[in-house]
Amino acid sequence: MRRIPRWRTVGAAAVVALAVAMLVPATSNAAEPVNDDAGPGCRFLDVPVPASVLDEQMVPAPGANVLAKAVNPGKPDLTVHGRLCLPHDGQVKTVMLALHGITYNNGYWNVGFEPEKYNYSRYMTDAGYAIFAIDRLGAGKSSKPPAALVTLDAQAAMVHQLIGKLRHGDIGGHRFERVVLVGYSYGSATTWRETSKYNDADAIITTAWGSTFQNGPLLRVFSTFQPAQLDPQFRDRPPGYLTLGPTGRDQDYFYDLSNVDPKMLRYSATELDDTLTAGEVASFYPRFGAVPLGQVPGGSTELELPLPHQTKSITVPTFLVNGTGELFFCGVNQQHCTSSQELQRQESKYFSEAACFRAAVIPNSGHNLNLQRNAPFAFETMRTFADEVLGPDGDNLDHYRATCSGISGSHVRPGPARFGAL
């Protein structure tokens, strides 16, 4: 195992402050050549997106794309790398666009360890869905713009571009009629931000997330980051890119350790670790909480994440899945995740009725739902929601909208719409 899980203090405030200085250009890594994956119906793709997505910032940054172009001369577009998988017959109308969290890459959805159990992409293609699991900007084999420009808002703008390309047949030559955004952790933050602004997906599934968070555990994780250039694996990343320090991931903060295979812990540490940017850290607090830019709240603080004009503006069917052992987003002593009904009650007040908000809790699971022994149950729960809302053929949306309002929004009461796993 490459890293031993322990906590070490490195000053999280310094991480946030670092983003302000990270407008320094650095040589960008071009994405590696496209290769066919050994998995049936899967292939890796490099998708161009305009550098103008970097202009989308909480603090307006006009001309940010000009800086990105200067860093990567002759290539005006950024590149998003991802793995597109289709069902065996190749006939599908609904695609899932999957977004990983910080310090991960698309491998979170494409696990190679016991893939029949832990591989989300395989599970969903077997269920009839297509899936495009990407490396977000700054991670994996996607472009590495200047760190301060790779923020939550820029990631959301990039996802908006990809949704349009999936609908128009510009990714893999397949025109998809329906798109489901699926997020994990920071990928869920990106999903909420993108949808609150564009509402261009047909449904969203978010995992390991919530509308309030425990700041102490989050600061503990932030304190384990170090400059990526100190890690031999990431020494070519630009200044301002971060990764886990020598002590690695705090396993007790990411897993229910009573329900995880030790071999999975080793696999995750050696195969799935990746980078994040100081810009992503710095944009987290002010974008989702009433916190001034650059300020880090105290460790004992429980903060509400969404500003009213954000999640309240989501108008597509929304699903949130957390584990009972979620330490970051389930409140003090995980009180918000004692049951699916309690998580529904806690979270629905942050959404309008148009979101048809649903929530589910996975027992004996922590932050890394896809990597726990009961990952198949989490996958089944997400698939059941997708089946009810859309289905692989995308035909169920009108019916779902007509029946879901009974338990959505602030009106938490029994309604006619149900789904099996809950």
Predicted segments — roles?
Residues 224-338:
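Alpha/beta-hydrolase
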